[in-house]
Amino acid sequence: VALINNQFLPYPYYAKPGAVRSPAQILQWQVLPNTVPAKSCQAQPTTLARHPHPRLSFMAIPPKKNQDKTDIPTINTIATVESTITPTTEAIVDTVATLEASSEVIESAPETNTDQVTSTVV
């Protein structure tokens, strides 16, 4: 155990020999592409190892535009309704029983008049 006295440490620091890495391990740490020095130390641009596609769980996917709206059928309110005039012929039957002022029973059939009436239905 080595005693390290430093003016910036309020108490003496004891370094353990097992905590010191070998030069080969330190070299591996310096070669890693993920290490980025502080911004003040970046004299030359460094390349960061990035994934070509970020994970989908971290991506915010905006909803589709047509999901926000409810499909409402378009109704053309300007279109005019053309009414077709259809002539309709109805038979009107008038049944008139002619009664005389006498008390005798009339055995004849009642008169039947049939008139043709034409009306227009809109």
Curated annotation (Swiss-Prot):
Keyword terms, alphabetized: Glycoprotein, Milk protein, Phosphoprotein, Secreted
Keyword Membrane (UniProt): no
Subcellular location as annotated: Secreted
GO cellular component entries: extracellular space
BP terms from Gene Ontology: lactation; protein stabilization
Coiled coil: none
Residues with PTM Phosphoserine: 102, 119
InterPro entries assigned to the protein according to its UniProt record, in alphabetical order: Casein_kappa
Superkingdom as given in the UniProt entry: Eukaryota
Annotated site location: Cleavage: 58-59
Known glycosylation sites: 74, 84, 86, 89, 95, 102, 118
Record function comment: Kappa-casein stabilizes micelle formation, preventing casein precipitation in milk.
Family indicated by similarity: Belongs to the kappa-casein family.
Descriptive protein name: Kappa-casein
Taxonomic source organism: Rangifer tarandus
Gene: CSN3
